[in-house]
Structure formats: C-alpha cells, structure tokens
Regions:
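Extended terminal and domain-junction accessory segments
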Residues: 8-9, 17-49, 110, 115-131, ...
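N-terminal, post-signal-peptide metal-ligating segments of extracellular/periplasmic oxidoreductases
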Residues: 3-175, 254-291, 319, 391-445, ...
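C-terminal structured "cap/appendage" subdomains that terminate the fold
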Residues: 479-523
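Short solvent-exposed strand-capping/beta-turn motif centered on an Asx-Ser/Thr pair
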Residues: 91-95, 294-299, 449-453
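Short strand-edge motifs at loop-to-beta-strand transitions and within beta-strands
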Residues: 174-178, 279, 328, 336-340, ...
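Active/binding-pocket-proximal capping segment
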Residues: 307-320, 451-485, 520-523, 532-537
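Histidine- and aromatic-rich segments of cupredoxin/plastocyanin-like copper-binding domains
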Residues: 155-163, 167-171, 237, 246-394
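A conserved hydrophobic secondary-structure block that centers on an alpha-helix together
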Residues: 171-188
Length: 544
C-alpha cells in the first residue's frame, strides 16, 4: 500500500475512533513533604551510579510502572561545589512499556479534532501515522534509548561531558565526567534525559533529579540557619488501563490535560511534588524556610502561588541575586528553577497552587492546579530575613560582536503536508547540520521571534543569558519577570511576540550543543537547533 492509497483510505474511514480527553487524576494528600535522598561530593569528586530502570511505584495510592533513576521518583539530589568533578555512570536498563507493537494497535492512530475549530489535527495525524508506519521498527528504539543532560551547568558539551547527541541503548553504560568550573554560580540545577524524539516520554515518566551547587550564598548567616527544602515538580501522564506513560503522538488542546493523543489513550495527568500528590509542608509561625523549586515538567508552566504569603526570591535558574526580591507569585516555565525564602504567617492551612494560565493552546488556559498545602502551626518564632546576599555574575564589559534573529514556528494542522511540526528558521532538528556558529569569549545578541500561537520556553545549553527586551506580552498577563539583570537558561517566548537576549560565550568551553523549546513534545517534533561554539579566534567568519 503506497502513501496516497493509505491517506485516502484513512480519510474515507474517518480515521477510526475519537480521541478521549484525559481526566484529572484522583489525588490523595495530607502526608508531610518528604526530603529527597542526597549524595554529596567529597574531596572534590562526586562519583555516582545512575541506573535508568523500569519499575513499579505507588503514585497517589495507585500502582504505576515508570522509568526512574535508581527506582526513585524523582532521582536523588546531587550536591557539588564549584571546581568539583562530577562523575556519573549512566546504566540504561529500561524495559519498553506503552509502545505500539502491532498493526492492529496502530490502525486507529488518527482521529477527531482539537477543541478549536481552527485546528485540523486529523490531517497532521495522517501524515505522522504514515511516517511512523514507514519506520515502525524504530519505535521501540525511540522509547528505550536514553542519555543525560545536566541542565544549567556551564560544562563542556563534548564527551565525556554534557554530550546530548549520545544514544545509549538498552543494557549499555556510559561514563560521564563533568568538570564543574570554579566560577559556577551556587544554586539549583537539574538532570534529565535528552534523547531527541523520546525526551518528553522519558520526562513524563519522572526521569529527573536536582543538582545543587553549594557556594557563597549558603554562608549568608540568615540563610545558613534556615530549614532548606528542595522541591521537584513533575508532570506525569499515565494511561488509565496500563498505568504506564503512553508512547503516542500528542496534539495541543485546552483543559486539565494539555493535549489529545493519537491513538486515543484515556489517561490522567499527575503533578507530584517529590513524588507525592498534594503533600503538606509544615512550618512554625514566623519561621523562614529556603525553598528550591524545579519545574521538571515536560509541558506545563507553573505559575506558583502560596496563599497569603510573599515569596522572597533569591535566585533564578541557579544564579543568585544580590538581595531578596519580594514577589506575590513566581512563574516557572518548563525547566525553570526558582529559589526563594518564605516566612510563615499566622497558624492555619494555606493553598499552594499553580494559577490558571494561558500558554497559547487552542481553547484557552490551563486551569488552576492544586499542588500542596502549607500548614502553619506550633510555637511562634521570628526568623531573621537577610537584606543582602552575594555579588551575582556580571555581563563582561565587551562589545556585542554579532546580532542574529531566529524564528520559531509551528504547524499542527497538517496543511504543509509534513504532519505536526515545530520549527526554527523553517527547519526541523538535524543532528548533522550546524544551525548557529559562535565564538567563545564573545558576546552576541539574539532576537527570538515567535510566529506561533503557543508560548515557547527557549533553553540554551551551556551559557546563561540576560533578556534585554520583550515584546508581545499578552495584555493583563502579570506573570512575566523582565528584570534585565536576571540570568536565565530558559525564558518564555510570547505568542506572536519576540525577545532579545544577550549572551556571553565563556572562553573555556567549546564544542557542539543545542538550543530548543523546553515544551518537550515541541522539541521532539523538531523545535531544536544545533550550536557550535568555536575556540576564541577561530570563528570562520572572522569579524561580525
């Protein structure tokens, strides 16, 4: 059967059954938020074995089967210091789950609609089905190969460092070795898989864990006395019948779950904190705690609110501030981290939630999402709050040598004949192509332009950046932090908007890496580009 015959047949039959909209998972709550296990460096070295395994776990009173790091959800917190050598032996022991295994399963692959009449996802699905039909033998490989990314660490992208182009097959091991620079800012980073086309599937399983770089901010007297909590927010998509993460195509819609699946897989979305659903976080009245929060979400932005409390932010994406900045709420796009101090108010129970937010999906915003409960009780205390912190990194006083424009676009209609696509400069990701070439030791400004209805949180590997201009913020949207001195490694691109970032390519790190949308289904569908960092003085173009 050729492609034309197949498409005609599927169109005539209505592309089989309709896609079911996943429901919000039933939750349990009331348990105290648990601390994650931690592993710390000693004598300048952290040597750790990370087993990627498929194992049963309990999630909200339900037995599920997930891919995990060492059987834990999420993985252990790795504590290191600037100048350390971080050695991770990654062992791939994934057992494939949730994969289409025969043509009977795959025939009902395409169906139905999104919740917005402007988007004809059926046509896109037909093309995607055909592409997968032609390469269906690779589906299992896409699901069970893996690798590792140390998100935010300013380390070499070359082997044995943060090489995201590696493909580590089942029963294979790989020894990573990361030389953490002596000037790595002290703060919160994280690790997760980065195998292109399967990244979303693996992070939906909960494959993630925090990396804490200790340093000067930890010695601030008031902070040193505080209770510290590291909180990983996962977003987990679990099928109702198999209790596994489905391996299917997804198309965006509105509602509790941000997409429909092809083939239709009735499923529920769970958003646990440290592997727990709706936990309690207990504090004494007047107590100040330091919270480190990572949005290890493949898709959803977390507009974090704590009812009745101010969040005194002390760092973003691992890089500290000079002084605390009080905020009524903090927006965490997928992959962002925020560190803040919270001082408990009067005794009582206070909601911790992600406020309803419109990421640009057809049909409207994601609804409000409860995350946890702050429980204030016990003896009154009065924890001191710091007024100053540490000197943050400064942008070097160098000229901007080059200015570039990158255009981000998407198509979920299938009208291009290429299926569901997310593109940069009109191109899907190609590992063999160099999309952008830069010179270490220089500063560039990039203007990112969004021709899409969706927000795209753009992540650049290795080097953080500062945002100097944002245009197109939706009217009335108060979630944006546009302070020009804040450093980011992931920043949201407004729908049909743009922003300009300024980035210093540190002189001691060269090699090939990537930049991409951190809505991981978008990255898997093509919205990623390759970045080659040349040694200083060896940029082939010479001057600007």
């Amino acid at each position: 059967m050729n492609r034309r015959t197949f498409l005609a047949l599927m169109a005539a039959t209505g592309a089989a059954g309709a896609v079911g909209n996943a429901s919000t998972a039933a939750h349990v709550g009331g348990e105290e938020l648990r601390d994650l296990p931690e592993v710390s460096s000693a004598n300048g070295i952290l040597d750790y074995e990370l087993n990627v395994v498929t194992n049963p776990l309990e999630l909200g009173g339900r037995q599920v089967t997930l891919e995990t790091y060492n059987g834990q959800l999420p993985g252990a917190a790795l504590r290191i210091r600037p100048g350390d050598n971080l050695r991770i032996l990654l062992k791939n022991r994934i057992v494939p789950v949730g994969i289409p295994t025969n043509d009977v399963f795959m025939l009902p692959y395409c169906a139905s609609k999104s919740n917005d009449a402007r988007y004809d996802t059926r046509r896109a699905c037909l093309h995607d089905f055909w592409n997968r039909w032609e390469r269906r033998q690779t589906l299992a490989q896409e699901a069970i190969d893996t690798n590792l990314h140390t998100h935010g660490l300013q380390v070499s992208p070359q082997d044995p460092g943060d090489n995201v182009f590696l493909q580590i097959g089942p029963l294979n091991d790989h020894q990573y070795s990361y030389d953490v620079p002596t000037d790595q800012p002290a703060g919160l980073y994280w690790y997760h898989p980065h195998f292109h086309t399967a990244t979303a599937h693996q992070v939906w399983n909960g494959l993630s864990g925090p990396i804490i770089v200790e340093g000067d901010i930890d010695a601030v007297p008031e902070i040193a006395e505080m209770r510290e909590r590291t909180i990983v927010i996962n977003e987990m998509w679990i099928a109702d019948d198999s209790a596994e993460v489905p391996f299917t195509l997804v198309a965006p819609v509105a509602g509790p779950v941000p997409f429909v699946s092809f083939p239709s897989v009735p499923a529920a979305m769970y958003v646990p904190l440290n592997g727990q659903l709706l936990p309690d976080i207990t504090m004494q009245p007047g107590e100040a705690q330091r919270w480190r929060v990572v949005a290890a979400t493949p898709h959803r932005s977390i507009w974090l609110h704590v009812e009745g409390h101010t969040l005194h932010q002390i760092g973003t994406d691992g890089i500290p501030y000079a002084s605390p900045r009080p905020r009524p709420h903090i927006m965490l796009a997928a992959a962002n981290r925020a560190e803040f101090i919270i001082k408990a108010g009067e005794p009582g129970r206070y909601r911790i939630y992600a406020e309803a937010y419109d990421q640009g999906h057809p049909g409207g915003p994601r609804p409000r999402l409860p995350l946890a409960t702050l429980v204030v009780r016990g003896k009154q205390v009065n924890s001191p709050m710091p007024s100053t912190l540490v000197e943050p990194p400064r942008m070097p006083d160098l000229p901007v040598v080059r200015r570039r424009t990158l255009v981000f676009s998407g198509d979920i209609t299938g009208r291009t004949g290429m299926g569901i696509q997310f593109l940069i400069d009109g191109k899907e990701m190609d590992h063999e192509r160099i999309d952008t070439e830069v010179e270490a030791g220089t500063i560039e400004e990039w203007t990112l332009v969004n021709e899409d209805i969706f927000q795209h949180p753009i992540h650049i590997h290795v080097n953080p950046f500062q945002v100097v201009d944002v245009q197109g913020i939706p009217p009335g949207d108060t979630s944006w932090n546009t302070e020009p001195d804040v450093w980011w490694d992931t920043f949201r691109l407004p729908p049909f908007g743009r922003y300009t970032l300024r980035m210093y390519f540190r002189p001691d790190i060269t090699g090939k890496t990537v930049y991409h949308c951190h809505i991981l289904p978008h990255e898997d569908r093509g919205m990623m580009g390759t970045l080659l960092i040349d040694p200083h003085g060896q940029y082939p173009g010479g001057g600007p």
